[in-house]
A protein has these predicted regions:
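PP2C/PPM-type serine/threonine phosphatase catalytic domain
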Residues: 4-277
């Protein structure tokens, strides 16, 4: 949403140099903060409880700007070597930082139920969050304390502005950027991930750059998803990253960890060379 809002004027032939500069300077932490604030406003009107981890990366020139809330991870791989790995953001083992809609207190649960019972309508398709109808006037006294975006002083919330990990990394053409959820890193060790990347690239001739750009990222993401799923589903697996971390915390755990798995892969391309991704 931040990118869309900041760059929408670029489609206008009357766009200014200021608009171009603002788009180029877009910060992923600010992007996550603005998106989260919008979600908070919309969720309070809907009475929705929930939370999510998030990792955002923006490529500007030769600089990759990264912001992370939680246990997603970004790899930057160059010439077959892992040169950067973003750090997970955790409160404690298996308790990542998250972007929450509301805190899980009795008051917020009661509020969400009340909002659901007193809504005058559902969110219309394509509506903007600031245009959504509020709850009935009969509920206004009860919810006035919640009718704002929470600040960092509100203890139950993690916020991108104050809590996100953020990095700026220089990239080169043909670098591989790999972004994945904890479902991958809880089930595959970094060495196993790198072995998979090497194996996929080994099937492409060094002279066939176009084919590598076109197919390698998809093959890598699909294969990693399948491997992570196989660890989850195989009762014979004797060790996984999640098991190792659990054991280090004094917990008994064997095998992989069931979870959803999301893997995105992309190759950095020179601006003058068309990139199929």
């Amino acid at each position: 949403m931040c990118i869309r809002d900041r760059c929408q004027s670029l489609d206008d032939p009357q766009g200014t140099d200021d608009s171009l500069s603002e788009c180029f300077m877009c910060n992923p932490v600010d992007m996550l903060q603005r998106a989260w604030e919008r979600c908070v406003r919309a969720s309070k009107r809907e009475g929705i409880l929930g939370s999510s981890t998030a990792l955002a990366a923006i490529l500007r020139g030769d600089e990759l700007r990264i912001a992370n809330m939680g246990d997603c991870v970004l790899f930057l791989i160059r010439d077959g070597k892992l040169i950067f790995r973003s750090a997970e953001q955790q409160h404690s083992f298996n308790y990542p930082l998250q972007l929450g809609m509301m805190d899980a207190t009795v008051e917020s649960v009661m509020l969400s139920r009340a909002l659901c019972m007193h809504r005058s309508g559902r969110i219309p398709a394509g509506a903007h969050d600031m245009d959504l109808p509020d709850v009935n006037d009969s509920m206004s006294d009860y919810i006035h304390m919640y009718d704002r975006v929470p600040s960092h002083d509100d203890v139950p919330y993690d916020t991108p502005q104050h809590d996100a990990g953020h990095w700026e990394v220089k990239v080169l053409p043909d670098d591989l950027v790999l972004v994945a959820s904890d479902g991958l890193f809880d089930n595959l060790f970094d060495d196993e991930i790198m072995d998979t990347v090497h194996d996929v690239f080994s099937h492409f001739a060094s002279s066939d750059l176009e084919a590598m750009q076109m197919y390698a990222p998809t093959l890598i993401s699909e294969r990693l998803c399948r491997l992570a799923r196989s660890v989850m589903d195989d009762p014979r697996v004797m060790c996984s990253p999640f098991q190792q971390h659990a054991n280090e915390e004094g917990m008994y755990y064997v095998g992989g960890k069931s979870d959803d798995v999301t893997v995105l892969a992309g190759l950095i391309a020179e601006q003058q060379r068309p990139c199929p991704l």
